[in-house]
Every structure is written in C-alpha cells, then in structure tokens.
C-alpha cells in the first residue's frame, strides 16, 4: 500500500512539474531533486524572473543545389535542334562573360532591315571571315509557334534556289537565325525601274519555280511569296526565303479556319481569295507566285484592299498594262491566278510545259557555270555539334586527291633489322644496309652456334632426339 502511495506522489509531482527537469538524486534514489521549487507568484514577479533565452539557430551553410546548373543554363546561349535546344559549345563562346554569343562569334557589319518581327543584320564570322545575314526576333514579338521559321528551315533540304539555313540559337531572350547572305531582294532590285526585261523575268520565274517546287515536294507551304521574300545573289540567281509563315502539310490541316496568324501577318496584296478566308494550300502559293511575277513584269499597282483588289483577281486588267510581258509568260500567269484554286497548275505541271521545259534546260546550263559558294561548300557551323547532320554535304564532293597527284613518286625502302648491334652502340652511327648485299659483309655473318645445357643434352640423348 505504501508503494502505491509513493508512486501516486511521484505522478503528481511529474504532472505539476512537467515543464521542469526532474531527476533522481544519487544519495537518495527515492527522493526527487529539482532545480527550483514550485511556488505561486504574481504576473509581475513572474515577469521579473529572468528566463534563459532560447538557443540561437545557426544558419546552415547552403549546399550546392542540383538545380543550380539548370538555372545557369537559362542565361546561356542555346542552339535550336530538331529535338530541342542544347547549350552552345563553341570555343568562341564563354558563358562566364556577360556578352552574347553573337558578340563572341560575329562582327557586326550593318543593318539590313527592320520590321514588326525584329531586325536583320549583316555580320562576319570571326573564325571563317564569311558574311551572313542574321535575323533577330525578340521574345516579346514571338507568337505561340515562336520557332516556326527555325524548324521550317530545318525541315527543308538544301536547294540552290532556297536561301540556305546555317543555324539558330536563343540568347538574351532573342531568337537568332543565321542565313545565307544575299545581295538584295527582288523588290529592291526592281525599285527605280519600270519592269524587268523578258530575259530577266524568265530567269526569276524559272528560279522561283524550282525553289517552290522543292518546297511542295517536301510537303511544305511558304504562305508568304512576294518580291520582298525573293532574294538575288550577285550573280542574279533568285532564291526563296523568309519562312516566317511556313507550314507543314503533314502535321497541319490544309483547310484550317484558325489560321489567324496568317490572316494577320500575310500581305493582302499577294493573297488569293481563299487564303484570306483561311484556306491554305499549294494553290494559294501558286497564286502568290503568279501575282508576284505579274507585278515585277508589268509594274502594276497591287492594292491591299479596295476597289482595285477584286478586278485583278478576276483578270480584268487593261491590255496596255500586260504589254511588257511575253505572250507565253502572260498565259502562264493567267492560269496561276485563276479564281478556282483547283484549276491552277502545280509546279510539276508548269515544268512540263514545252516552253518552260526548254527555257529551264537553258537556265540550268547557265547556272552550272556560275560559281556558287554556298552550293558546293559545306555549312560552317560554329558549334561543336551540327544541328542537322543530314544537311551536311557528302564527303564525296570534296576533292582531296589534288594533294597527292602533284607529289613526287618514290619507291619506299624499308631497312632490314640489324641484330649485330650491342646495347651500348648508337643506332644512328650504323648505316642502313644497301639494296644489293656485299659479299663478306658483316650483315651476312651467321649467328654463332650455341650448344644446349648438359641436362638438356642428356635428356635428348636418352630419347635419341639429339645428335652431337
């Protein structure tokens, strides 16, 4: 009974002093020893009692975050590839510096143009001293499909009548697209003249016909063909460029009423009636191509809207305006601008025309003799890995045998091994043996016979395999 009462007293003590340190005394194990007595006091006296301040939590040293590298990558220049984006690994680029990849790898030459998309500048590569046109598009002016132009270039195989794409990267919230440097646009070339002569007009028609046919054969639509997007080299070879509104027929529906991006960005001067309503197809490209040839061949005024817009699409054009064009080309343009899209000829059908076929044969012969630097030389990538391995030119086109054809023909001679040299002799003091051995030469000395040890001799003698 006494033990039960003692346990109850201990329990009461623990309950009353649950916030205090309680321990058993060494001298009297059954007696409780506390640091202070339990007493009733006022709030004033309680406030005067000094309490031990809580321990200070020392700040721990921050450990290296596993996401720190990912945060650094956001500020680094990233090259765009068909599978995503990667950090640029060029030796010309140092991520530790605040300068952009453009400042590291290029020298700025001049501004080529500005627009609602951004700007285009001419720059010279510091490693190759080649000139390029670099298109800069700020992120604030990019739409949802912000990489449409870059991926459009990647999906198009190289062609001599399409502006060549080299690479694209993102840096400092700006999309950069590195392109082939051309001389000027077709619109700038025609500025200040009435119209193109028949020979030049046919060359423009044939060059763009081949480039547009290459696009359509790869299931791509340009959607913005006009003289401003047709570029000329110094040798007057026309190339199709500016793929800001390009679309893939394999991944996007042809008849899509949600083509608001095209309806807002497309130029109404060169759009067909069905394209304005949102129906994009190869026939809408054919219409834009035909009306562009009409403009540079006749110097006709193309309104973006108004009373003159509809008569042109109905081919209600005065004869005196069409007079500078040849009859064959005029008939082709009329077919290309037919109000019924399905009645317009395709690029392959235009190439089968007997007049076009003959002129195309002559044009190809002319272009073959024109030195095209971008056509035959491999693409100069500034990064460690190519974003498009399939776009690189084949090594079979590189003529590497020129270095060996001019070399002097000699028969190599390999000297025989000399076993007569001692370890301490200098091998450079010994001449190589001649081709014709000399009699009684030290090179013909036979090796001295070495008799085997006696134990081995006795072993062979027992087996009758050794003759002395």
Curated annotation (Swiss-Prot):
Its EC number is 2.7.11.1. CDD domains: PKc_Myt1. It comes from the Eukaryota. It is an enzyme of class 2 (transferase). Residues 25-63, 425-453 are annotated as: Disordered. GO terms for cellular component: cytoplasm; nucleus. SUPFAM superfamilies: Protein kinase-like (PK-like) (SSF56112). GO terms for biological process: cell differentiation; cell division; meiotic cell cycle; negative regulation of G2/M transition of mitotic cell cycle; negative regulation of G2/MI transition of meiotic cell cycle. Gene3D superfamilies: Phosphorylase Kinase, domain 1 (3.30.200.20), Transferase(Phosphotransferase) domain 1 (1.10.510.10). Signal peptide: none annotated. The keyword Cell cycle applies. In the 12-13-cell embryo, expressed in the E blastomere. In the 16-cell embryo, expressed in the eight AB cells. Acts as a negative regulator of entry into mitosis (G2 to M transition) by phosphorylation of the CDK1 kinase. Belongs to the protein kinase superfamily. Ser/Thr protein kinase family. WEE1 subfamily. This is Membrane-associated tyrosine- and threonine-specific cdc2-inhibitory kinase wee-1.1.
